[in-house]
């Protein structure tokens, strides 16, 4: 990682494999996550080269997409070449996030993922063969509970 405002290189760190995607936590501006080709996801403090904040094996195949909800603090989504999308609660105790919900979207390997800008529990993912799938996770009790907790309810 390099801070473009400085002439010298910033903090660098290794992931578990080739990095597929990175995302900033919109509620903790110095935290970023990276998903890698092994299915691992690692969180780091951007200004420190120390040990990761946490890491986990999120998927059985490449963690091809990672993104944070911009409306529900601590809600992370990951998508994978294993065709699944998983939601994680990063807002709790230190250490790896707790799993919240998972869904196989039945569109093959997944390559892109995003939260809806208005509804914090609706996600869209793009898969192999040009397929796009929507998942309204509000019907999943774990996802709904995580969102309510993020809202302080």
Regions found by a protein language model. Name each.
Residues 4-7, 46-49, 90-93, 138-140:
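Short loop/turn segments that connect beta-strands within beta-propeller blades
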Residues 31, 40-42, 84-86, 131:
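A conserved positional marker within WD40/Gbeta-like beta-propeller blades
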Residues 40-44, 49, 53-55:
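Detector for outer-membrane/organellar transmembrane beta-barrel domains
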Residues 23-29, 66-73, 79, 114-120:
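Loop/turn segments within WD40 beta-propeller blades
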Residues 6, 13-19, 49, 56-63, ...:
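WD40/WD-repeat beta-propeller blade N-cap
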Residues 62, 72, 84, 90-153:
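Terminal intrinsically disordered, low-complexity extensions flanking WD-repeat/beta-propeller proteins
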Residues 4, 35-38, 78-82, 126-129:
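Conserved strand-to-loop turn within each blade of WD40 beta-propeller repeats
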């Amino acid at each position: 990682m390099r801070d473009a405002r400085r002439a010298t290189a910033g903090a660098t760190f290794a992931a578990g494999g080739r990095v597929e995607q990175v995302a900033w936590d919109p509620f903790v501006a110095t935290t970023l996550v990276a998903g890698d080709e092994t299915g691992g996801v690692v969180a780091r403090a951007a200004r420190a080269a120390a040990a990761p904040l946490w890491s986990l094996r999120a998927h059985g195949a490449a963690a091809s997409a990672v993104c944070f909800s911009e409306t529900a603090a601590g809600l992370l989504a990951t998508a994978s070449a294993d065709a699944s999308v998983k939601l994680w609660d990063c807002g709790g105790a230190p250490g790896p996030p707790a799993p919240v919900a998972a869904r196989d979207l039945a569109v093959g390997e997944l390559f892109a993922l995003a939260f809806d800008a208005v509804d914090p529990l609706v996600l869209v993912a793009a898969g192999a063969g040009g397929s796009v799938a929507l998942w309204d996770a509000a019907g999943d009790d774990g996802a709904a509970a995580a969102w309510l907790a993020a809202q302080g309810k």
